[in-house]
């Protein structure tokens, strides 16, 4: 059993592998919890669901860009700093795997931030606008990481 800072004990749950057989980098709820300092009161299932959503969003974003299947892009010949395998899984370097992991974990962190504030209400005068600002900042981390994977700068006209 682990003790959370909220006065109750949450049973320790086993880490759940995320997207382990697709050819994309494998992730896990335990690693996410450790790297993003996720509170213990979130069940592994809730974290798994969030990570699966984030993985699907980021993979779709990357594949749509690489294959030219997104608004404003007609070419199917987009240059990116990695190759795609036969299953459309990228052949990422170790550095790119780290960047991908950061993109997914930041996106899920932003996704779960609304739950954080609902469960962890601080002082009565807590400013909810601050939570939204934090959520946007964390989501921006994810978007910057995806742009880096695609070989793009921090911002572009098509991102506006």
Where are these regions (language model features)?
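Short loop/turn elements at secondary-structure junctions
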Residues: 87-160
